[in-house]
Curated annotation (Swiss-Prot):
Claim: Nucleotide-binding is one of the keywords in the record: yes
Record-given protein name: Nucleotide-binding protein CPS_1098
Record flagged with keyword Nucleotide-binding: yes
A GO molecular-function annotation: nucleotide binding
Length: 160
């Protein structure tokens, strides 16, 4: 009986590479000349530091574009509130790992709502989907990809 797992993982090595590339790009950008701005990689978080709120927003967009180049979904990125201390601003970015219980329930409800001949079960931080045919699992994969959920999902452990 074919089965697969739906998980939500982020490749932290690719995130680190994106942070390094973003730091390099900031040093060469004209709008950041003479400004103290940096990305700090504190696994699994990133701390953005700049002299102004507007620059933090630009840095966040820059980070998103670098993540997209490295094939890391920006939905996995959770941006915190900007905080000021003196003349410096900082903002923390975290990455969602695993599927929370509420999201897993929403995912199972979505799959069962399509009336496909599959069973979906929550197993910790992942959702196991089993069906009689491989085509049904592929239909579930397509359904999850097209659904407007605020988290990115990957499909692993595909067994025939």
């Amino acid at each position: 009986m074919p089965s697969m797992d739906i998980v939500s993982e982020t490749d932290l090595e690719e995130v680190r590479n994106a942070v390094d590339n973003a730091n390099r790009e900031i040093t060469t950008r004209f709008d950041f000349r003479g400004v103290e701005a940096s990305f700090e990689w504190k696994k699994p978080n990133i701390i953005l530091k700049a002299e102004g709120d507007f620059q933090l927003k630009q840095m966040c967009d820059l980070l998103r574009s670098q993540l997209a180049k490295r094939n890391v979904d920006a939905k996995a990125m959770a941006v915190g509130d900007a905080s000021a201390s003196g003349r410096n601003w900082s903002q923390q970015v975290t990455f969602k790992e695993g599927i929370e219980q509420d999201m897993a329930k929403q995912l199972v409800k979505l799959i069962k709502g399509e009336k496909l001949k599959v069973q979906a079960a929550i197993q910790g931080e992942q959702v196991r989907v089993t069906g009689k045919k491989r085509d049904e699992l592929q239909a579930v994969m397509q359904l999850v990809r097209t659904a407007e959920l605020e988290q990115s999902f990957q499909f692993t452990n595909f067994k025939d």
